Design a protein with these regions (language model features):
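Acidic/histidine-enriched alpha-helical segments
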Residues: 45-55, 82-85, 186-205
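His/Asp/Glu-rich mid-to-C-terminal helical/loop segments that flank catalytic regions of hydrolases
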Residues: 30, 152-202
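Sec-exported extracytoplasmic/periplasmic mature domains
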Residues: 34-44, 70-74, 110-118, 177-188
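C-terminal recognition in membrane/secretory proteostasis and scaffolding
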Residues: 156, 204-211
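Metal-dependent peptidase/peptidase-like ectodomains
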Residues: 55-150, 165
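Catalytic-core environment of secreted peptidases
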Residues: 1-53, 73
Length: 211
């Protein structure tokens, strides 16, 4: 999903241009890969297993994450929570955490805020944009979506590495690592509240149901 094409009209003629997806979503993938390395290096500190998955087909209404949960992975009932890393490359756009107002996940975020952190996310009450967390909500799995939000270069040829803020991404990575560790070491499970999800997503884009 990190590169594609778009058709623009130049001098009255359709011209196909490449867009590179540096922020959408090579930035999230880069954070995921480095986070996986950090978790592996410090695996003895994690009480729960942490599974890293990169989903494709987001433009097909998140078919990749749907397929993982419904066709590929047999142990979805053992998933306690999901962390969605999507578009994390901007430095002047804010850093957000969307949980569909999940009390348990918000409690972890607030606990982390009381500790020394390189950056803190703003908890968003409303879904910032649809992403792969949607498929996990459909399975009643709590999920948090970390992102720097929407941006004008998305799905255009201007989505190049020049718009990325690498220092900010490093701060986000360190925070997300600390959050992942706190989530993995938390006592008990995390409750899913379907009423919260339906309320927060009711005015957002529809998601196709696959069979």
């Amino acid at each position: 999903d990190n590169s594609g094409t778009m058709t623009m009209t130049v001098d009255g003629k359709p011209v196909e241009r490449i867009y590179y997806g540096a922020n959408g979503n090579a930035s999230g993938l880069a954070v995921l890969v480095e986070l996986a390395r950090m978790v592996k290096t410090n695996s003895i500190m994690f009480r729960r297993s942490v599974l890293f998955v990169a989903f494709g087909a987001s433009s097909e209404t998140f078919a990749g994450s749907w397929y993982f949960l419904n066709r590929s992975f047999p142990d979805t009932g053992n998933i306690d929570a999901m962390i969605n890393l999507d578009m994390l490359g901007l430095g002047n756009n804010g850093f957000y955490a969307y949980t569909a107002s999940n009390t348990d996940l918000n409690a972890v975020i607030r606990t982390q805020a009381g500790e020394l952190q390189p950056i803190l996310p703003e908890i968003s009450a409303m879904e910032i944009y649809p992403s792969d967390h949607r498929a996990f909500y459909d399975k009643e799995i709590p999920a948090v979506h970390f992102t720097t939000g929407r941006y004008s270069e998305h799905n255009t040829e201007r989505d190049t590495q020049s718009i990325l803020d690498y220092e900010n991404m490093e701060r986000e990575l360190e925070y997300i690592y600390n959050f992942t560790l706190a989530l993995a070491d938390a006592d008990g499970g995390f409750a899913f509240r379907s009423a919260d999800v339906s309320q927060k997503n009711r005015d957002s884009e529809d998601v196709t149901a696959y069979n």
